[in-house]
Amino acid sequence: MGRINEKFNLQQKAFVIWLIICVFIPLNGNEFSSRFLKHFDYREIGPTRQGGRVVSIAVSSQDSYVYYVGAGPGGLWKTINNGNTFESIFDNEGTSGIGHVTLDPSNHDFVWVGTGESNLRNSTQYGDGIYKSIDGGKSWSNMGLRNTQHIGKVIVHPQNSDIVYVAAQGQYYTDNDERGVYKTLDGGKSWKKILSVKHAKIHVGVTDLVMDPRDPNVLYAASYQRIRRPWGFSNAGPKSGIYKTTDGGKKWVKLSRGLPSGLLGKIGLAIYPNDPDILYAIIEDANSPEMSFDERWIEIQNCKPSSKPTVGNIVYRSDDAGITWYQASEGNVGGRSNYYGQIIVDPNNDKIVYVLSEKVDISKDAGKTWSRAFEYGGDNHVLWINPTDSRHMILGYDYGFARSYDSGKNWIHFDNVSLAQLYAINFDMDFPYNVYGGMQDFGTWKGPSIKKGRFPIRFEDWEHVLGGDGFYMHVDPTDSRWLYCQAQFGELSRNDQKTGVRKPIQYSANKDLRFNWSTPFLLSSHNPKIIYHGANVLLKSSNMGDQWQEISPDLTKNDLSKNGGIESWSYGTITAIAESPLKKGVLWIGTDDGNVQITTDDGENWKLLNENIPNNPEYWVSRLIASHHQFGTAYLSFTGRHRSDFKPYLYKTTDYGETWIPIANNLPIEPINVIREDHKNPNLLFVGTDRTVYVTIDGGLTWHEMKNDLPTIPIHDLAIHPRENDLIVGTHGRGFYIADISPLQEINQILLEEDAYLFNIKPKVQWVMPSQKVVADQNFEGENEPHGPIIHYYLKNSIPDGVKLSIYDDQKFINELNGPGQKGMNSVMWGLTKRGRSKTKEEIAKWDKEVATGEREPFYDYYDTNEYFVTPGEEVGITGLSLSTRVAWEPGMEGREYEYLRVKPGNYRIVIKIYDKEYERNALILEDIWYDQ
């Protein structure tokens, strides 16, 4: 063992020496971030109708136009106008995972958020405690309970804002003490656990909590004994139950008269506000009449599905404040309780009860009979009913939320909030290119990376290409007609994007194969007709999926005691595949049970690499990437979140896996979901964690946060477009973001020693303005790219008066731009204009007067066709008011001293002069030859 450690130490020392020699930027992290990274902006492009899981809604009792919407992994949103617009108000906190949001009844500017989603599924986002705002969500303070991770309910005392109760489920994947009910008497400065439930030494969480509106010292709590494992889920136990306190939590009594005993799962509670003696509970009864307690308990502890029928989800009612209960429903109501388990009583009629699951069920006779409440939603998690008008509802579900004013007969889905939960993303090579994303419970979607002209990207611009839950997808880079996409458990399809025909192509000859919930596959970079698909073996097709062959043995640990959990999340499966783009036949795979293997002969022989990885956690392999630049080089990441280990695990090999070097280095304690290597700069790497994006420009020696205007959000996938040099970010809760990273690709030591540096300028198409479809006002506006080229430049030292950039058409000076002079990287956009005639003194004086008095109105540009370039030599102004399309004002279109004309497509020179030295780049403006496509 000592010799092995010595070997790794020598490797690490050699690697560090090599990094020091080739290090690109000798800056500390803060300096690099402030001088460079802050200038990289992300464009949020949506989509919106294809939303994400909404789990909590808090409506002001003083003004129902004001409410807060909590998305499981997608943060917190606020409206003050009944949903016409929403503002994201939780973008920069430590987590985006929302468990519950509530308003202080005494002061609605006081908002409490329990973080960490309480719906127990494989992609649920954890939190970091409880937050408080005293200004309606403008600012937040973390008030502790950081290790609870998942909070099911928060209740504020109706007369005393300092008293708050929290129902904490605790960590999902391990036992921890931070489970139970907590109480604060000082507004969150300190907390005391007031209900602790244990089974032997195991702590049991609390998932629901309700308060008697007559007496705030009376509370009911639902405990939930459960734990998730990487291979399955133990969803019930003997310590799940309902507890009551009548003295604010000093003493609790477990309620039992009329309630089931034995093995119980998740419990949802509801109290009728007009008569709080009436309570409802929906209880998952996991007992089986055909099995003994011990037999069933062993199955649950081993995360195995029940071998015999269980009782199911039963509704109970109490009419005497929980002293006695009776079974209200005759049979099973609702679906998977761990993912739902919500029961709601109409605030104005105690006989009307709703249960949320895949659908919404309703009983109008106090739970005796049940029917479908309405045909809307899907995988429903929260239902708010207006206490003064039961017709007014807000429903939250897996793809967003909606409002009804007629008890659910008709709904309005909110299309102005971007909440898409992406598992995987990709792109095509069309021009402009499209992005593709596989979404939680909403299939696979395709949308534009940009819009021609300057209009925003709307939800109408997105196309649904596959149903189910959406995961990995690939587009043939030589012919975007062929799209391969996938639903859960490896359900692979080939889509003909020309005809719309879809053909299922998943390998089915071997029924014993195991496919992961999110099964990886790829198209060979050497031949896109070749597909590699991961099960517990690696599959290969040489003819676009029409026939398959198994090219490996079982590449997992194949632990039969763990394969197949209670929710059928297949375990012992391949979770990552990489192919060398430099050498055909070199394939890498990683599995969910920690194996890393390589073949160099297209599957003829395989080698297990686990022992070569120093301090190998043998966790779930989240990503494997083969280098674009060096033979034998690959990157490997593990995620430990399935074992409650949140440290980053990241490795690099340069010798086909014989040796590995840890390169997580200064990355914070956040699990890594994805790593990408830049296709131009081998030392430029990006990782996506459960919180944000990080970048290194020295091959992993130092990492820098690249959050900027990106919200705190889990990053499940990253892609780099090889032609456009765009970093495409797939978030699990906020859709797509795109950033131009081309300047990062150029950064090197020589650059930084210069007084200044002008980066290469990306070509820009001068798009013909298309006609715009009429869309609803209440619609999300995805950010389009700037219509003119962005000019980036570096300054070694600051220039207080800024810099001037001169633009030339060949040798002719045509325009001048004013740019910032900050130390580090700067940028300015050229609006594709040139100077026209000089303004008269009278016009300048009029301008100055209007500016001084505030009378000057914003200037807008009107144009919508390419006709102004039809006549050779024609000079076209940018004030064509006779044309029909108005687009927003942008700097540089109008000046104090000059009128401006629009330039024609061509090659222009951009010159910046610093300390008597000129720096020059070409700016290629392309004609729109695609306008009629």
Model-flagged regions — what are they?
Residues 14-26:
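Bacterial N-terminal signal peptides
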Residues 30-779, 786-787, 798:
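Beta-propeller blade termini and top-face loops
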Residues 493-495, 789-792, 798-816, 907-911:
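Beta-strand-rich binding/interaction modules
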Residues 617, 813-902:
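Glycine-centered tight-turn motifs at strand-turn-strand junctions
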Residues 770-802, 808, 825-829:
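Contiguous beta-strand segments within globular domains
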Residues 917-932:
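Short beta-strand elements
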